[in-house]
Amino acid sequence: MPAALQRRSWVPAASEDHVLAIAADAAARDALGIAAEIERLADDNHRIHDREGLNLNPATNVMNPAAEALLSRGLGSRASLGYPGDKYEVGLEAIERIEVIAAELAAEVFGSKFAEVRVSSGALSNLYVFMATCRPGDTIIAPPPAIGGHVTHHAAGAAGLYGLKTVPAPVDADGYTVDAAALARLAREVKPKLITIGGSLNLFPHPVPAIREVADSVGAKLLFDAAHLSGMVAGKAWPQPLEEGAHAITMSTYKSLGGPAGGLIVSNDAALMERIDAIAYPGLTANSDAGRTAALARGLLDWKVHGRAYAAAMRETAQALAHALDAEGLPVFAKARGFTQSHQFALEAAHWGGGQRAAKKLAEGGLLACGIGLPIAPVEGDINGLRLGVPEIVRLGFTPDDMPQLASWIARALEGGGASVAAEVRERRTRLGGLRYIVR
């Protein structure tokens, strides 16, 4: 039978051709054939990520198997609306205890008084805070893409879809963050209701206390987006945003935190969290995935026990890899500042035609990464940076001592030696043991 999906004129033609070819293949199969194909694809994904490749993309991680197993324990399909102790449905005695345990662990790990664990993504976590602090038509100030500012804070993302006007924050290019003095002048001019900090690449601590002073001076709230920094914050290897003045922290739970896909909001501001709670229920979340909540709780336990060691190892390993790549002659961004104080850093990617082109060269060697914006000259038709991170490889057992070898693989793959690098990466994966920094 022909595919039910039809061509979408608004999608790039090459992508849509690919989509429709997959749809046609699925439409031509019977039910058993589709089931077999899904199983095959799941196995193929496992091969790509877990048997033959190394993830250097800080936007992903590997889960504690005990946490991952909770996703298939029959929890997620049980509707769970309302507050523990007074749920709309009955039979939720176990699930509501899981919800409370997850929130308690989140509050412990992030040093907060309140935690909202029902959010299904980091983007929605940001939207909840936007809705709790602003009204459509209000102005916010957010980091621009040149310093890793995420789309959810801008016109094409949650902020714009909610009707907010985003003004890009002024940039401190050397520190890969905002310029606090210039921000103060801008805030007096545009009168924002919310100022955000944090993004898709974080190299050095952001000036959160100074930004809070700016926010207070114009009556704004301060949101710290820890989508990528959540693990570093949880492991106390990064300044604590709530202690430094952020009104709330939002995050994804599957990046450096190494949990299931989803979002999380923590705060010490009771009035703000009361508004966020009403947005979550009965507003936009209503019923949530209890399986994800259980997996999140199990993953947060890793941070309660091993968080400091894991975060410190990530920072040390990222710094070692950045220095090793510099020794290979590669253009590591922010050399004058020591490259990074976090779990991630970037290469200037113009030499390879841009970050996405460079990432495709790395993929030929079994090394998975992606592009990122940097406050340097643009690259026509591509992103000007290549983002690298170490959360997953550290959990797999890589240490700073392994970074010269990894840097050599990266350098060779970027110059066209992907085939030989891929063979060496596959062999190295066969010698890896169990995961580190997890509670078994």
Curated annotation (Swiss-Prot):
InterPro entries: PyrdxlP-dep_Trfase (IPR015424), PyrdxlP-dep_Trfase_major (IPR015421), PyrdxlP-dep_Trfase_small (IPR015422), Ser_HO-MeTrfase (IPR001085), Ser_HO-MeTrfase-like (IPR049943), SHMT-like_dom (IPR039429)
Cofactor(s) recorded in Swiss-Prot or TrEMBL: pyridoxal 5'-phosphate
N6-(pyridoxal phosphate)lysine: residues bearing it: K255
Pfam families: SHMT (PF00464)
Class of this enzyme: lyase
Record key words, sorted: Lyase, Pyridoxal phosphate
One GO CC annotation: cytoplasm
Transmembrane segments: none
Catalytic reactions on record: 2-methyl-L-serine = formaldehyde + L-alanine
Molecular function via GO: glycine hydroxymethyltransferase activity; lyase activity; pyridoxal phosphate binding
Record family assignment: Belongs to the SHMT family. Alpha-methylserine aldolase subfamily.
Stored PANTHER family: SERINE HYDROXYMETHYLTRANSFERASE (PTHR11680), SERINE HYDROXYMETHYLTRANSFERASE 1 (PTHR11680:SF35)
Subunit structure: Homodimer.
Biological function: Catalyzes the reversible interconversion of alpha-methyl-L-serine to L-alanine and formaldehyde.
Protein name, as recorded: Alpha-methylserine aldolase
Organism: Variovorax paradoxus
